[in-house]
Swiss-Prot record:
It comes from Opitutus terrae (strain DSM 11246 / JCM 15787 / PB90-1). GO terms for molecular function: structural constituent of ribosome. The keyword Isomerase does not apply. It holds the Pfam family Ribosomal_L27. One of its GO terms (biological process) is translation. The gene is rpmA. InterPro entries: Ribosomal_bL27 (IPR001684), Ribosomal_bL27_CS (IPR018261). HAMAP family: Ribosomal_bL27. Keywords: Ribonucleoprotein, Ribosomal protein. Residues 1-22 are annotated as: Disordered. Belongs to the bacterial ribosomal protein bL27 family. GO terms for cellular component: cytosolic large ribosomal subunit. The keyword Ribonucleoprotein applies. This is Large ribosomal subunit protein bL27.
Amino acid sequence: MAHKTGQSSSSNGRESKSKRLGVKTFGGQKVLAGTIIIRQRGTRLHAGRNVGTGRDWTLFALKDGVVKFDKPHRRVEIVAS
């Protein structure tokens, strides 16, 4: 029999990196076309007027203006300034 046992590896260290999701531009803020408004998984919020949706459901401004969140309809739009 061995007089020393084998080393066991740590059971920690498998956590994935955070994906930095969430609101990047808040309601009332001015934005330029192309500015990211929200990074999300799935359509938690939908694109309204002057807002585009990326391949990963990112919402971004299509025109310059002010961000407006429509809470009851879960929609984001850009009001042209």
